[in-house]
Structure formats: structure tokens, C-alpha cells
From Swiss-Prot:
It comes from Burkholderia mallei (strain ATCC 23344). It comes from the Bacteria. Substrate binds at residues 19-28, 110, 137-138, 213, 251, 364. Belongs to the succinylarginine dihydrolase family. The keyword Hydrolase applies. It holds the Pfam family AstB. This is N-succinylarginine dihydrolase. Its EC number is 3.5.3.23.
Length: 446
């Protein structure tokens, strides 16, 4: 059946700021307490969506979550009217207010793991929201994520939107940032590839400096839940030393699409065994795996983390070639820029590189791949998606004007104590649900 990959990017929320909440994320920590520009952040992401849609790629948008999360603050013991809750949290525990105000749901690669209907036992598209239990500011996202996905992919005959896995360290799940899929054609059965940082119940190497956020047990549970074929499901461990170097998700060191894996030499434990397993599984489906392995002598792990070379989007074009979408930081790193020039000049599957300014997201550790959730849809499934979430000229214009109307152009961590920010955000989100036709999505609307 004819199918295409759609990308659903997260729209950056009005509370976008740099609070340095993500230990293990080098960019997040290094930009802590600097001023952010929510308006610029949202527009940078929206421009990427529009330009990719203009190139013919299926491009959707996912709305921000309500922030600050008054639900979290009340659960943590702050009481009174909404303004009182914010004031008390700002005075007594500003780090908790920062966690409750994070716009991190913009990085929809962590929203869920998605398996297309060609791979699942019941021939539905399956979504499992990630529990993101390693970080407080992200662990509060999954319920709203489930609600949003259920609103957009509402046809239960075609879509299965699950709850997140239990939020325990043994089942730490970071979503599609540690998952990719290989196939000959999008509509054909494929090989699903899960990458984990550690295993809870068996001994193995683990990082020592930064935590491994994804467990083998979580990856396996998602595969079981989605009804994936064992022979077409591959698990690999990310190298602990690269986690300690700031590779907190696999999508900071590798990206794959269709029959191509683009990765760093040091991405995986026992990398040749990983390549062999993927090649064998994909070969059984009639396709040949192309591995583009970047040697450390050309691009070091430090260069990869600093430029986010691998936190790129690998997009398949109609002519069978692939296009790489990278942040502008890749052009500002001499080693990475030289590698990309040589890559495009070669005769491999990647024939084009597009560069985007995503500086506001990048300063928090999120590149092009972080901002998108990939969903493979056949024609009938695409027709069942809520129509107003697809990016085109009209929706782009509406969202661009909406950002101009509602977003601040400067936000520092101390501004999170401003009770007006909550009112501004709610007003913006209430209008957004009307633009996107999603109904009463947020707690304050119910």
C-alpha cells in the first residue's frame, strides 16, 4: 500500500527559557540562566516546517503543552489561587517552578515511539508516549502527549494511542529519539531499531558521568506492546563513553531512514554486530542496508555533539535520494562542514544538505531531529488525521500571526515568576486549539 513518512514538529511554547534542567545535555547546562527569545524560537521552528512542506514533504504540527503546569505545582504542595501558587513556588523552590514552566515538549522526538501499520500485528499505527521519567520537567509531559495524539489520530480503527509505560527507572523511555525504522518502501514491512543506554536486569557497560536514560526493558516493552515481529526488531546499546560525552539520546550520534543508517563510528557497542543484524533483517525483507559511518578522525564525538551533525533529519525524496536537514552550527564547525561537502560530492544516497537556523532550540540541546516526530501513514490513515494540523500556506500564515500576537521576545528564568505569563500562555493556547481544530485539549479549557 502507498505510504509516506510525515513529520510532526513541536511548536515551541510561550515559556521557552534556559533553566539548565537537563543534566547530561551539554548545551542545556552551558546556557543556563541566559535570556531566551520565545518568539524567535517559535518562528525558527515554524519556518523549518514550512520550507520542508514547500519541498513536498508531509509536515504536521503538534501544539505546545500548557505551561507553567499548575497541576504539578499543586501536587508538590503549593496552594491558593493560581498567582499565589506561582509566587510561592518562585520564592520557596524556583527550581520546581522552572521544571513546571519548561517548554521541552517542543522536542517531539521524545513525545512517543511510533510503529506504522505495516509492522504491527493488528495493522494499526501504534503510539506509545514516552514516560521521560529521568527528568521531572519532562516526566510531566506524557499525559498531555497522549491526549494530543488521541485528538489528532482519533480514528481507533486505524490508530492505537497507548498510555506511557510505568514511570520507573527500570522502564525509562525517551521515545523516538532512541528509535528508527528501516524499510525498502514506507508502505512495506520494515525493521524497527531500538537503541538503549543500559539494561536494568542484566549486567553490561554503563556510563559513569551522565545517566543512561533509555533502558533495554523499556524498548522491549514498547516493541511487545506494538505487536512487532521479533525477527524484524533489533536492539542495540549505545556506547557508554559517548553518553558521558554528552550524547544523551541516540539521535545525537545516529539517524536513519528507509535503507540508510548515518552514524558516528562510536555510536554503538559492538557496531559491526549491529550493522550485520540490521542488514540481515532488512535483507530478509528484500532491501539492502546502506551504512554511512563517519570516522572519528573526520568528525570527533565532541564535534558531533557541538554541531549536532547527527541530530539531523534524513528525508527520502521522490527520486530515491536522501536529503539531510542540519542546523547552521554544522556549517560553523570546520570539520563538520568539510565532511558534509565531501558527503554530498560523493556517490552515496545523501545528495543534498539543507541548513536551518534553529539557534534558540539548539541552545537548549535540540536540533532538527529533536523537533520532529516521524509517523508513516498510508493514504487512508493520512485522510483520518485531523486536517488542520497539516502545514500549508494558510496554516503557516495563521501560526506566524499567532506567534506575533502572543509571544514575548525575551524571557529569563526570573520572568517565570510573573503571573501574567500564565495568563498570556493560556490565552495563546486557547486560540491555538481553535486554529488547529483540536477542541478542549488543555486542563484550563475543561
Amino acid at each position: 500500500m502507498n505510504a509516506k513518512e510525515a513529520n510532526f514538529d513541536g511548536l515551541v511554547g510561550p515559556t521557552h527559557n534556559y533553566a539548565g534542567l537537563s543534566f547530561g545535555n551539554v548545551a542545556s547546562l552551558s546556557n543556563e540562566k541566559s535570556d531566551a527569545n520565545p518568539k524567535a524560537a517559535a518562528k525558527q521552528g515554524l519556518r523549518k516546517m514550512k520550507q520542508l512542506a514547500d519541498l513536498g514533504f508531509a509536515q504536521g504540527v503538534l501544539p505546545p503543552q500548557e505551561r507553567p503546569s499548575l497541576r504539578l505545582l499543586r501536587e508538590l504542595g503549593f496552594s491558593g489561587k493560581d498567582a499565589d501558587v506561582i509566587a510561592k513556588a518562585a520564592r520557596q523552590a524556583p527550581e520546581l517552578l522552572a521544571a513546571a514552566s519548561s517548554a521541552s515538549a517542543m522536542w517531539t522526538a521524545n513525545a512517543a515511539t511510533v510503529s506504522p501499520s505495516a509492522d504491527t500485528s493488528d495493522a494499526r499505527v501504534h503510539f506509545t508516549p514516552a514516560n521521560l521519567c529521568s527528568k521531572l520537567h519532562r516526566a510531566i509531559e506524557h499525559e498531555s502527549t497522549r491526549r494530543t495524539l488521541a485528538a489528532i489520530f482519533a480514528d481507533e480503527a486505524r490508530f492505537a494511542v497507548h498510555d506511557a509505560l510505568p514511570g520507573t527507572p527500570a522502564l525509562g523511555d525517551e521515545g523516538a529519539a532512541n528509535h528508527t525504522r528501516f524499510c525498502a518502501e514506507y508502505g512495506a514491512p520494515g525493521v524497527e531499531f531500538f537503541v538503549y543506554g543500559r539494561a536494568e536486569y542484566r549486567r553490561g557497560p554503563e556510563p559513569t558521568r551522565f545517566p543512561a536514560r533509555q533502558t533495554f526493558e523499556a524498548s522491549r516493552a514498547v516493541a511487545h506492546r506494538h505487536g512487532l515481529r521479533e525477527e524484524a526488531t533489533i536492539y542495540a546499546q549505545q556506547r557508554p563513553d559517548v553518553i558521558d560525552a554528552g550524547v544523551f539520546h541516540n539521535d545525537v550520534i545516529a539517524v536513519g531512514n528507509r535503507d540508510t543508517l548515518f552514524c558516528h563510528e562510536h555510536a554503538f557497542v559492538d557496531r559491526q554486530a549491529v550493522y550485520d543484524a540490521l542488514a540481515a533483517s532488512l535483507g530478509a525483507l528484500g532491501a539492502q542496508l546502506n551504512v554511512i559511518e563517519v570516522p572519528d578522525r573526520a568528525v570527533s564525538v565532541a564535534d558531533a555533539v557541538g554541531s549536532y551533525l547527527f541530530n539531523s533529519q534524513l528525508l527520502a525524496r521522490e527520486d530515491g535520494t536522501q536529503m539531510l536537514v542540519v542546523p547552521q552550527e554544522c556549517r560553523e564547525n570546520a570539520n563538520v562542514a568539510a565532511y558534509l561537502d565531501a558527503l554530498v560530492a560523493g556517490n552515496g544516497p545523501i545528495r543534498d544538505v539543507r541548513v536551518f537556523d534553529l539557534r534558540e532550540s539548539m541552545k537548549n540541546g535540540g536540533g532538527p531531529a529533536c523537533l520532529r516526530l516521524r509517523v508513516v501513514l498510508n493514504d487512508a490513515e493520512r485522510a483520518a488525521v485531523k486536517p488542520n494540523v497539516w502545514i500549508g500556506d494558510a496554516l503557516f500564515a495563521s501560526l506566524d500571526a499567532w506567534i506575533d500576537k502572543h509571544y514575548r521576545d525575551r524571557l529569563s528564568p526570573v520572568d517565570l515568576a510573573d503571573p501574567a505569563l500564565l495568563d498570556e500562555s493560556r490565552t495563546a493556547l486557547d486560540e491555538l486549539t481553535q486554529i488547529l481544530g483540536l477542541g478542549s485539549l488543555y486542563d484550563f479549557q475543561r
